[in-house]
Amino acid sequence: MGTAMSESPAHDTRHHSYSPGLEGVIAGESALCLVDEGEAGLLYRGYGIADLADHSTFEEVAYLLLFGHLPTPQEMKAFAVQMTEQSLLPRPVEAFLDVVPKGSHPMDVLRTGMSILGMTDPEAGDNSAEAKVRKSVRLLAQIPLFISAADRFDRGAPLLPRHSDLSFAENLLYLLTGQKGDDRAKAMARVLDVSLILYAEHEFNASTFSARVTASTMTDLHSAITSAIGTLKGPLHGGANEAVAQMFLEIGSPAKAERWVRESLASKRRIM
């Protein structure tokens, strides 16, 4: 007891560095996507985003990201059949939507719905790489149905059936709005298709990072995606889109845009 206790830190930090927000830290690598600040821009598995947006569909891009190559016509046909066969919402999911409080935030509904889809997945106990690919295809088929069902339940509108002869974007537009077939619907579906392609992969953004952290614990696919949805909801991530949409509604028309921006700058208001 007579020996003096030395005062020293509990851990030796001489070989460690602190990086707020992980700035400058390489947390991992991705073979799926590259966000290049130079001329290359955004690349999915080596393909430039402009080429994919101009010449591919969202389904083809999803196949590319899942399997590593663009599909042949035969592979694309089989992929479409798979998604059609998986286009069903389990009864517990529909029961959940029936009791969701009116006016709930769509991201809250999607986050909770993803958990229920995980519990009801026919391969819930299988976390093999092969099963995760099948679950991913299943979710590609289920999520448009879920999003449209959540919206229509909230509005008290009847649910609409998926059409196997429509593309992914055409189906999503139809399920949400009931519009299909005419020139206006086709133009809207094309815009939606390009938007889906542009949002499909962004390398190591916040929601991808949170999903990878969750997945690194060897948990299931749905849990990792649930983490990503919770992260995406934040106003500094995907929630910024919601703020922009609200801004457009507030401005009202192009003629009012300049005045709105000037007044916002004068009041030091954040412009999204």
Predicted regions and their residues:
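Hydrophobic alpha-helical bundle cores within soluble ligand-binding/oligomerization subdomains
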Residues: 2-272
